[in-house]
Every structure is written in structure tokens, then in C-alpha cells.
Amino acid sequence: MCMTDPIADMLTRIRNAQSAEQKEIKMPSSKLKKAILKILKEEGYIENFQEDPNHKKPSISVILKYFNGEPVITSISRVSKPGLRSYKSKNDLPRVMNGLGVAIVSTSKGVMTERTARMAGVGGELLCVVT
């Protein structure tokens, strides 16, 4: 099956698993997905993730995080899509819910949060927004 937007697929898997109250999900692996999941873990939105190299195709297991039975991620959405890319300069990077949420940006210095990109003085492609 040809997947045109693997990042949107990953975000949809997370959203669907949390609405079904699943503890763990598996998905195909890529460097960009691992970078996004690393940021989600650092920001406290997921418990953990690890790569499973045992399969023919490498996959990632993600352990989702809940607080009092409610998902920690209230909304997760893709901003830049294959049909309509969204690039922002360092001055145009959004502040999500006045700093309570996080926007993930792909820059020339790697994948980082909008706060880190603003401090580093770089802009880039706005991948997704998480609250």
C-alpha cells in the first residue's frame, strides 16, 4: 500500500488509539517519525517509544500516556501537508495556546519545537500542532 503522508498516518494512529483507550500502538518506522516521537516524549505527551528491529520492516512501539483515565494529548493535528506545505520564518512561528501546547517544526538544524527554533533563530516547515 502506498502511503502519501506517513506523518499524518502516525498522528491519526495516535489519535485513534487514545480515543479507544489503548496503552500501546505499533507503526512503521522512519527517521522523521522517531524525531517527532522524541519531542513528544520530552514534552511529556507520550510515556515512551522504542524501535522493534525484529520484523522485516522496522516498526516503532509507542506507549501512550494517560492522566486520571484521560489522554494527555487533547488534540494533535497535521499543519503542513504534501499538497500544501506550510513554511514559517522564526518570527511567524505560532505560540500554541500561549505556550501550553507545542508546534513541531522541521528546520535546517533538525526537528524541534517552535520554542527551540525561535531561540535558535531558524524557521522551517510547520509539521504539526499538539495540545
Curated annotation (Swiss-Prot):
Q: Name one GO molecular function term.
A: structural constituent of ribosome
Question: Could you identify this protein by its name?
Answer: Small ribosomal subunit protein uS8
GO annotation (BP), single: translation
Q: Which UniProt keywords apply?
A: Ribonucleoprotein, Ribosomal protein, RNA-binding, rRNA-binding
Signal peptide start-end:
none
Cell membrane recorded as keyword: no
Family named by the database record: Belongs to the universal ribosomal protein uS8 family.
Q: What does this protein do?
A: One of the primary rRNA binding proteins, it binds directly to 16S rRNA central domain where it helps coordinate assembly of the platform of the 30S subunit.
Which is a Pfam family this sequence falls into? Ribosomal_S8
Does the UniProt entry include the keyword Ribosomal protein?
yes
PANTHER family, A to Z = 40S RIBOSOMAL PROTEIN S15A
Where does it sit, as one GO cellular component term?
Answer: ribosome
InterPro entries under this entry? Ribosomal_uS8 (IPR000630), Ribosomal_uS8_CS (IPR047863), Ribosomal_uS8_sf (IPR035987)
Organism name = Nitrosomonas europaea (strain ATCC 19718 / CIP 103999 / KCTC 2705 / NBRC 14298)
Q: How does it assemble?
A: Part of the 30S ribosomal subunit. Contacts proteins S5 and S12.
